[in-house]
Regions:
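Class I S-adenosyl-L-methionine-dependent methyltransferase catalytic core
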Residues: 1-161
């Protein structure tokens, strides 16, 4: 079964799934901090100002630029800031392949919180990762995401489509 995303031909922007928006808890961001240079400029391309990425990284003294499709900033069309040190976020699951493709094209260090299931599933994906330098970091427990920042408890095992 082919799982690569079908692209919207008119816009050249990958189509998103309505279940793509899950929010990351702080405990999934904190392990990244030790790998970042102090006072870095970080672009969070899938994040609103309420994002845990924005809040945690800013609180650690980093300059953070957040952009989000809902406020008109499309990651696939947005001009990458020249002086950005890192690109960090939790991308929409249904377009993660296209996100990684663009990140490799941009050529800046990045950290994307994604599940590894299906990451290398197709030959196209496998080749893309094989042709680029990247590292993986695994957590010692499964991440429980929020569907709404107002939720008291994270949603366990969110659906991925």
């Amino acid at each position: 079964m082919k799982l690569d995303l079908i692209t919207n031909k008119a816009e050249k922007t990958p189509s998103r799934n309505e279940n793509d928006e899950f929010y990351t808890p702080n405990y999934a961001i904190i392990p990244l901090l030790k790998y970042l240079k102090p006072k870095s400029f970080i672009w969070c391309p899938f994040d609103s100002v309420d994002s845990s990425f924005v809040k945690v990284l800013s609180a650690e003294g980093h300059k953070v630029l957040n952009t989000h499709i809902e406020s008109g900033e499309d990651f696939f069309k947005y001009k990458t800031p020249n002086n950005v040190d890192y690109i960090i976020s939790n991308p929409p699951y249904s377009i993660k392949f296209e996100v990684f493709k663009r990140l490799f094209e941009i050529g800046k260090p990045f950290a994307m919180l994604v599940g590894v299931v299906g990451l290398f599933e197709s030959q196209k994906r496998f080749t893309m990762f094989a042709d680029n330098d990247f590292e993986t970091m695994y957590f010692d427990k499964r991440i429980s995401y929020f569907k709404d920042y107002k939720d008291v408890k994270p949603k366990l095992n969110p659906p991925f489509f």
